Every structure is written in structure tokens, then in C-alpha cells.
């Protein structure tokens, strides 16, 4: 078993680690890359939520994606099926893309690059949901709020790029 499978299985084996590892990583990255002062003076698209909404929203999303990974792991703990093996790769890849967004947008101040990352992330999560469906349909369903939020985040990121 390669490193990706080992990481996925060690994280997803228990529902609490599956849920808390993404939350902890997201919290660390979120607190490492705060919006710059000039960000507050930039134009925002309509329906932009207050900054205080992002922390709770992402916490819930990380919990749901983590729980989805646990459900997929439980469906095939030995990772025998292609859906399980490919899903583990996609899950780790989408986490990497997710965790890259804040450094790109806030750290490097590259909103267009962050938008490209968000497009890749959305594609990965959609592919992950499709991959997990035959193995664990409930796991795929737990990704629906995440996909919906990524669509909204794409709107916000694109709006920011167009307005500034």
C-alpha cells in the first residue's frame, strides 16, 4: 500500500479523526493566512457574507467531508475496489487543493490563481462524489453541501477578480 492509502486509511478509520483532521488543518491554514488590510477596501460581489460566516461554514464543511471519507473507508476498509483506491487519491488531492486556496488568495494575493485552484478543487470533489457513489452512496451525498459551497465560493472569487 502506498503513502496515499496509508494517509487516507489512518485518517478515515475513525469518524472522529476523519472529521477532526480536516477541521484542524483548515483551522491552522485559516489562521495562518488572514485577509490583508487592503482586502477589506476591495469591492466585493453581491451576496458576499460577513467575514464571521466563513469560519463556521468551513468547519461544518470539513466535518461533513471528513465524515464522508469515513463512510467510504467503512465500505471497503481493505481498499480492494477501484472506487476505494481512486477515491482515496481524489480525497487527498481535493484536501491539498482546498488547503492551497487561502495561501494563493491571501498569502500571495493571487485571486486569479486561487480561482483556478477553486475550479480544480470543484472538479476533484465532483469526481470524488461520482467515484464514491457505487461504493458508498451516502458518502457521496455528504459531499453535496461542500459542492454547493464551492459553487458559491467560485461566484465570490470570480466576482472579486472581475470587480478589482
UniProtKB/Swiss-Prot annotation:
A GO BP annotation: tetrapyrrole metabolic process
Q: Name one GO cellular component term.
A: mitochondrial outer membrane
Keywords noted in UniProt:
Membrane, Mitochondrion, Transmembrane, Transmembrane helix
Membrane-crossing ranges are: 16-34, 52-72, 89-106, 112-132, 141-163
Q: Which CDD domains match?
A: TSPO_MBR
Major subcellular site:
mitochondrion
* Organism of derivation: Schizosaccharomyces pombe (strain 972 / ATCC 24843) (Fission yeast)
Q: Does the keyword Cell division apply?
A: no
Q: Where is it located? A: Mitochondrion membrane
| Function (record text) | May play a role in the transport of porphyrins and heme.
Q: From which domain of life does this come?
A: Eukaryota
Q: Which family does it belong to?
A: Belongs to the TspO/BZRP family.
PANTHER family, per database record: PERIPHERAL-TYPE BENZODIAZEPINE RECEPTOR, TRANSLOCATOR PROTEIN
Provide the protein name.
Translocator protein homolog
* Topology relative to the membrane: Multi-pass membrane protein
User: Does the UniProt entry include the keyword Transmembrane?
Assistant: yes
